[in-house]
Structure formats: C-alpha cells, structure tokens
Swiss-Prot record:
Keyword list, A-Z: Protein biosynthesis, Transferase
Keyword Metal-binding listed: no
Cellular component terms (Gene Ontology): cytosol
Residues given in the record as (6S)-5,6,7,8-tetrahydrofolate binding sites: S115, L116, L117, P118
Family per similarity comment: Belongs to the Fmt family.
This protein's name: Methionyl-tRNA formyltransferase
Function, as annotated: Attaches a formyl group to the free amino group of methionyl-tRNA(fMet). The formyl group appears to play a dual role in the initiator identity of N-formylmethionyl-tRNA by promoting its recognition by IF2 and preventing the misappropriation of this tRNA by the elongation apparatus.
GO biological process per UniProt: conversion of methionyl-tRNA to N-formyl-methionyl-tRNA
One term of GO molecular function: methionyl-tRNA formyltransferase activity
Group of enzyme by EC: transferase
InterPro entries: Fmt, Formyl_trans_C, Formyl_transf_N, Formyl_transf_N_sf, Formyl_transferase-like_C_sf, GART_AS, Met-tRNA-FMT_C, Met-tRNA-FMT_N
The organism of origin for this protein: Deinococcus radiodurans (strain ATCC 13939 / DSM 20539 / JCM 16871 / CCUG 27074 / LMG 4051 / NBRC 15346 / NCIMB 9279 / VKM B-1422 / R1)
Length: 318
C-alpha cells in the first residue's frame, strides 16, 4: 500500500518505546502531524531535551506539536484539524485526551496498549504483567475514549513472555508487535468491528513508585524474581541490610530454604537468600553512592556470612 492510498495519520507519542511504531506508520501511511510531550530538563545540567519521538520527528522533517495542555487549547485543536488527519494513533503519549480533541479526526483515535485488555489498564502494563507472573501478554488496538484504556477493542494479538525476559526485553518485543498490529488495523480500519471490553475482567496497572522495587523477602522466591523482572528498567530492585539501601541485580532462583531474608550461602556464584518459599541467588550488589560489585565481593567486604539476615520490608497496610 502506498502512503497516499491509506488514511492520513496524526501520531501522539513520546518515549523511545514508540519509535518503531512511528517508523512503521511513516513507511505505510502519510504522517501529517506528530504530537509529543514538551521538552523537559534532563541530566545534571538540566538541559531542555525533547522526548525521543519529538527528536525523531524533527530529524524526519515531520510536522511536530508539543502542547503543554490539550484541554481548552484552541490553537492545538486548529492545528490538528488543519493537518487533515483522518485518524490519530496514540502510543504511550502520556496525557489524557479530552472529548474536544477526540472528535477531530474522522475515524477518531486508536490507541496501542501493551496488554490484553481489559487486563492491565493503566500506565505500566508491561511491568505489572511481569510482577504478577504472567506468561502471556500482548498488544491491543482499541478505540480511544475519555476513560483510562476503556474503549472498544479492534484488534488483539498475544505474545508469550520468555522466562528470562525483564521489562527491558518485553518492552522491545511489544514495541515491534505494536508497530505491526497498528499497521494492520489501519489497513482494515473500515472493516473492523469494535468489541466492548468486559468490565468484570478489568485489572489495573498503575504507574510504578520506588517502593514497588523493594524486595518482599516473605514472598515466594518466584514472586521475588518476577518483581525483579518487572522493575528492571525502573525503579530497579532494592533491598535493605543493616538499615542500608542496596540495589540488587542478576537475580535467579536459588537452592535452599530458611527464614525470609536469611543468607543461606555466600559463594562465587553469588549470594543465596531465603524467601517465604525457596530462595533466590543474587549476582550483583550496588551499595548507595557506590559502584555495582559482585555479591560475593560485597559480602566479604561487609563480613556478611551464612546466617546473616536482610532487613524485612512490607508495604504499609491500608
């Protein structure tokens, strides 16, 4: 299909995750407008930096808008209307779309969501699918309404989750899947039948907070490992030992059992720590304000031996 033969597309997105989707769209259709979040201060120098999608759009010479707000923004509404977009596609854009904007394109807005809706509605579906131990996830193409991922479903495709994947690898796989699926949806846009979501099956995937990365040693070892996989990109896995905060990496299932948080073994293969059921092996430890180091080196430097115990942390109740 030539770009001229398909619908004209406005693309609303910001992070690097959405770049394969942008490339797929511009290869198949005419992208008449890219809409991204405003530039933000980054790094120690707080240099204003465009989000990855905005930077790529500028490189490609695509029309670009970065409005600070959408609701009540007559100038932006006019820009979207004047672009001639037949349909708009959103992919991790990061802003709720008001009704006045949703109504502008002739075919409305389509959202690429990285879960099998209605499961894992919200900002962090990839991370929570891993934390909850899912073995299959996928991508949904849905019509956007004013709710949070509540619109009718147009297309879905499953993706098996490999046991070694963290949120980094799963994000990359879903990004490519989303790129292919949105092209398929746009090619057949006028023949797709929207299917309402089953509200009774809805689950939620809220934005992660730092505490989501804290190890719950009382959990089964598999749950500790699944949490590690889910928070690998951010906030990463954090544990406490003697009141001091540590970042943990290279977690795998270990051998043995004991009191949650108890060190079962210190060796060249890492640090084996008991969980509520089973144990995990930790390859790398990073103390606060220090470089990451092999767990055995850290243990020797801190005189951590078999029988020592990590601090227990539990999420506050209520």
């Amino acid at each position: 299909m030539s770009a001229a033969a398909g619908p004209k597309v406005a693309f609303f997105a910001s992070p690097a995750f959405a770049l394969p989707v942008l490339e797929a769209l511009r290869a198949e259709f005419e992208v008449v407008l890219v809409v991204a979040q405003p530039d933000k201060p980054v790094g120690r120098g707080l240099k204003l930096t465009p989000p990855p999608v905005a930077a790529r759009a500028a490189e490609l010479g695509l029309p670009l808008a970065q409005p600070h707000k959408l609701r009540g923004n007559a100038d932006f509404a006019a820009q979207l209307r004047d672009s001639g977009a037949d349909v708009a596609v959103t992919c991790a854009y990061g802003k709720i779309l008001p009704a006045g904007v949703l109504e502008i394109p002739r075919f409305g807005f389509l959202n690429t969501h990285t879960s099998l809706l209605p499961r894992y509605r919200g900002a962090a579906p990839i991370q929570w699918a891993l934390i909850r131990g899912e073995t299959v996830t996928g991508t949904t193409i849905m019509q956007t309404d004013e709710g949070m991922d509540t619109g009718p479903v147009l297309l879905q495709e499953e993706l098996p989750i490999r046991p070694e994947w963290t949120s980094v690898e799963l994000s990359a796989a879903l990004s490519e899947q989303a790129a292919a699926l949105i092209v398929r949806a746009l090619r057949t846009l006028e023949t797709l039948t929207p299917q309402p979501q089953d509200e009774a099956q809805a689950t939620h995937a809220p934005l992660l907070v730092k505490e989501d990365g804290f190890v719950r040693w009382a959990d089964p070892a598999q749950a500790v490992l699944d949490r590690f996989r889910g928070v690998a990109a951010w906030p990463q896995t954090t544990a406490f030992f003697g009141g001091k905060r540590l970042k943990l990496a290279g977690l795998t299932l270990g051998q043995g059992k004991g009191q949650p948080g108890k060190v079962l073994q210190v060796g060249a293969g890492g640090l084996t720590v008991a969980c509520g059921e089973g144990a995990v092996c930790i390859a790398t430890v990073q103390p606060e304000a220090k470089k990451a180091q092999p767990a055995q080196v850290w243990a020797q430097g801190q005189n951590v031996e078999q029988g020592a115990r990590f601090d227990l942390w539990e999420p506050p109740q209520g």
